[in-house]
A protein has these predicted regions:
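Short glycine-enriched loops at secondary-structure junctions
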Residues: 79, 134, 311, 408-409
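Feature captures C-terminal
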Residues: 16-17, 315-444
Length: 444
């Protein structure tokens, strides 16, 4: 008996809802066909740079996933690290789908909201084993309250489980990126299909590596994926992979209206939470200084270094969560380190010199959601004639101070001098949450 199963997949939406109406119609049109379909989301659906995602702590995304008819989902780093542990523990509470992630633990047990794998039985009794793993950012999952495990070790372990070994087809939902996916395809012949994400790669008609099929659908809902899997008497016979450019799908004027409406809805929710009324609008310089003051207070630090490009727009007179989100849209937290005066000098000079090169460059990734790097600024010390001046006096090269920076400086490739330092990553608050708490304390 021949059986056709169709898998629909979406990955790395990052709250780019402008394409969502087309994606929704694509999913619903396929789900209405007389073919058994399974709809998947491969993670990084949530991104708090969108005001509605910020206002709902990701729950609005989950509701939209429900509307797509998603049945199985895994998480990316935007869920696992971008959300606090408290928010991630709650975000899927009203989901109509099953979350799978096989290399994340809450201490030593599985998260209450996820399964390490599932066995999906089709209408004709074919058994599909779905496994899922997310990229192991060891340095950030642990301070966020999670234990992240090596996905290769977890895969080896899971492949020894009888119901996975006995399944008619083994499918990996991967938020690991193309390098991991390629390695798994080369080393694990037991995996029949890898549906990829994380590195935003696109396989328009799929790839085949040593007998394992690979699919991936880019990012931001610019593409959606469809995979037709054919079985004969429960034996896998063929996998046909397709992707569809959403620019080529039928659109309607109401699509852009809907996207504008949900953005406005998010902004309105954020606007309702007033933080402070300043005597007058702040200049960019004043806004930057306030951000550094908040960083120093939160971290209990002596000195701070930032780049002015972090503040996308200066703080307005009547300042709400909406204004804060627009000014600091980044998915960044803080990092602090104890350094000697000599080390502070080396760090500052490195950041300043590299900052001169980066000043007008467009910056992407590492949580940055602004445009340009901007000017390097500092607080708590001065830099004069090649020396660090602290409390209006030169300090001994061995005297230690606590420095606070944004974590982007530690993770990005620009500032290699920080990679060798012992850095404490401060969770769970994002930079804008730190500023919000500081402003609230100012009004008490």
């Amino acid at each position: 008996m021949t059986e056709l199963i169709r898998i629909l997949h979406l990955n790395d939406l990052h709250s780019h809802f402008e394409n969502f109406p087309k994606v929704k119609r694509f999913f619903h049109d396929n789900q209405a066909q007389p073919i058994e379909t399974i709809s998947l989301d491969l993670g990084d659906n949530i991104d708090k740079s969108h005001p509605l995602t910020e206002a709902s702590s990701g729950k609005a995304n989950v509701q939209l996933m429900n509307e797509l008819g998603i049945e199985l989902a895994t998480i990316g780093n935007n869920e696992g690290v971008g959300l606090s542990k408290k928010d991630l523990d709650q975000v899927y509470k009203d989901s109509d789908f099953t979350v799978i992630v096989g290399n994340l633990k809450d201490n030593i047990i599985e998260p209450s909201w996820a399964k390490p794998y599932i066995i999906y039985e089709t209408q004709q009794g074919t058994k599909l084993a779905f496994l899922a793993y997310t990229f192991p950012y060891y340095k950030t999952y642990e301070p966020n309250g999670w234990t992240i495990e090596d996905p290769i070790d977890c895969l080896k372990c899971h492949l020894q489980i009888n119901e996975i070994k006995e399944a008619n087809c083994r499918i990996l939902m991967s938020h690991l990126g193309i390098r991991f996916d390629t390695r798994i395809a080369q080393e694990f012949s037991e995996i029949d299909l890898i549906i990829g994400a994380h590195t935003h790669h696109l396989f328009e008609e799929g790839e085949l590596i040593t007998g394992t099929y690979l699919a991936a659908a880019g990012k931001y809902g610019r593409f959606v994926g469809s995979i037709d899997i054919t079985f004969d008497n429960h034996t896998l016979k063929d996998i046909l992979i397709s992707t569809y450019d959403t620019k080529q799908l039928t659109g309607y004027p109401s699509d852009s209206d809907w996207a504008k409406e949900i953005e406005s809805e998010g902004k309105e929710q954020l606007r309702k939470e007033s933080l402070i009324s300043f005597p007058a609008p702040l200049s960019l310089e004043e806004s930057c200084q306030l951000v550094m003051d908040a960083m120093l207070f939160y971290a209990g630090a002596d000195v701070a270094i930032i780049n002015s490009g972090l503040i996308v727009q200066p703080f307005e007179k009547d300042f709400s969560r909406k204004n804060l989100h627009e000014s600091l849209p980044h998915k960044m937290r803080l990092a602090k380190l104890t350094v000697s005066s000599q080390e502070l000098l080396e760090i500052y000079e490195t950041i300043y010199q590299q900052g001169q090169f980066l000043a007008q460059q467009k910056i992407h990734g590492m949580g940055f959601r602004g445009k340009y790097f901007g000017e390097v600024l500092h607080s708590g010390f001065d830099y004069k004639n090649g020396k660090i001046v602290y409390n209006e006096k030169d300090i001994d090269a061995k005297e230690e101070v606590i420095l606070v920076i944004v974590d982007q400086y530690y993770f990005a490739s620009y500032f290699e001098c920080l990679k060798t330092k012992k850095v404490d990553l401060l969770f769970p608050e994002l930079l804008r949450d730190v500023v919000a708490d500081y402003l609230i304390n100012m009004t008490l």
